[in-house]
Amino acid sequence: MTTVIAVDLGGTNLRAALVGSDATILAHTAVPTPTAGLSGAVITAAIIARVEALLALPEGREVTAIGVASAGPLDPGRGWVTNSPNIAFPVVEITGPIGDRFGLPVSLINDARAGVLGERWAGAARGSDNVVYITLSTGIGGGAVVNGRLLLGMDGNAGDIGHIPVDTHYNLVCGCGFAGHWEAYASAKNIPQFFAAWRKAADVRRVAFDAGSPRAIFGAARTEDPVALAFMEVLGEVNARGVSAVIVAYDPEIIVLDGPLARYYGDIVIRYMEPRIDRYLPLPRITVSSLAGRSPLLGAAAYALDRAAGGPGI
C-alpha cells in the first residue's frame, strides 16, 4: 500500500499523519501551532519535526510524498503561506525547505480545499460530484468540487468564502482588514466580538453567562438561555447569508460542515440557519462531518497521492 504524510497547518493546531492509499490513518501526531518567534521558519521547523517523527515509525519507511494543507492565502508558485489572518507570521515557506530536507515531493493546498477532498474520499460526500465543504473554525473557509473537479482558481485560493460580505449594519472588521465579512461574525475567533456588538445594539443589559468564548455562548443556547437564543437568531441569519451565497455560486448536492463549532454545536448552527436559507433557495443536504476533524488531513493525503502519481492533485 502506498503511504504519504499529510500535514494540516491551522491557526490553532498543527497535525500530521501517516495515511495509506485506502484512506486509513496509520499514525497521527499534533502540537499547538507556533505563534512566537522571529519568522515563519519556526512553523516550518515544527512541520519538519512532525514529519521526522512519523518517518521514524515502521510504517514511515514506504512514504512516497508529503501533502500540506494550510490556512490561506497561499502562493502555490513559491510554495508559501502568505499573509494568513489566522497564522502569526506573514510568510511561511513550505514546499522548498520541506522538500529539500526529505527529498520527497511536497504539495501545498488550502486546508478547506483539502477538506472537501477528504470528505469526498472518505466522508459524508463520498461518491458525490457536487460538494461544498465549510469549516467553522478559527476562521471560516470553504472548498468546492463541481462536476467532479476541485475548484482551485488562479492561485489556489478559490473558495475563500469567509470573506463573503454578509453585513453592513455592525460593520465588524475581519482579520484581513476589511469589514462585513462572514468570518468577522461567525468564526470561533470572532463570535464573542459579534455578541458584544449585538448586545450593545440590542441594549441587552443583563447576561447570565460568560460571553467571552463561543463555547460559553453556544453552551448557554443549549440550556435555552433566552439571551443566547436571541443571539442565535441573529447569528443564524448571518450564517444563512453566507451559505446562501455558496449555494448560488456552486449549486451543490451536499454541504458538509466541519470545524469545532460544527462538530460540537452543529445541531444548533443548522437549526437557526436552515429555515433562513429555505425562504429564498432550494436547500441541498446540509450535514456535519463524521471525520472528527481529519478531513483536511485526508484531503492533503489524497492531493499528495494524486500529484505523486502525475495527476493534477484532484
Language model segments and positions:
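A short acidic/small-residue loop/turn micro-motif
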Residues: 32-35, 89, 158-160, 166
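A charged helix-plus-loop insertion that forms the helical arch/lid used to bind
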Residues: 79-90
